[in-house]
Amino acid sequence: MPDIQILSPHLADLIAAGEVVERPASVVKELVENAFDAGARTVTVELRGGGATYLRVTDDGCGMTPEDAGIAFLRHATSKLHDAQGLEAIGTMGFRGEALAAISAVSHITLTTRRRGAPGGTHMTLDAGEIQDMYETGCPEGTTMIVRDLFFNTPARRKFLKSDRAEGAACAAAALRCALGRPDVSVRCIRDGEELFFSPGDNKLDSCVYSLLGRDLAMSLLPCAGEADGVRVHGFLSSPAAGRGSRAQQYFFCNGRWIRSAALQAALEQAYRNTLLV
């Protein structure tokens, strides 16, 4: 037998899942971004504990046909990219077709979806990426995804999850970042029956910030905007008096997507160098 072996599809899926799904917050990010790409105007994130046991994302987006639902959890299945030329014009949050396959490989999933204008919907259950049941059902337009027992078949991954408190906070933070990047979509986050935040979805960044980050912070912010070389920048900056000793509430977005950027952080801190201790 040769030393080099081709991985089984199941093992390849588990490895890929480890790259895409690091913790429950990764699932929140991927499912909320999928809802945005589906044209949702409202998204609700519900979790219990830290999100590993139970996590539900509901949207009123375009939904899926039974045919699309049947292949949505296969690796490299995507509705967002069809040829190489499309790579030059990607305008969606995701396009690789890996997230749903990765999530389903390490969890139990219940999907309920109905295409806009369709007379009925589809209910489907999956265990470790394998479809267990699929049938027609009545449901609202849009999609509801329930993810249970994340990492049930990869105990080493589950062992390294933090406390429910920490994982739940990370899930809420992921949903909040998504909401800040899309003030045109109403996002609600609920943990153990308690609403953590709600954004109005009125496409006004100031009211979005007010709802998500609180009145005191919102009232201390100063609007800023500029454009150069085809790049437009807009947002809010805090007054020096409202400065904080950490970067915890520095948020940068590119085309609606939250990003980490050491260069942008450095530029921001350089601008404040004479007024803040950073």
Question: Where are the regions a protein language model picked out?
Answer:
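N-terminal phosphate-binding caps/lids of nucleotide- and nucleic-acid-binding domains
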Residues: 1-278
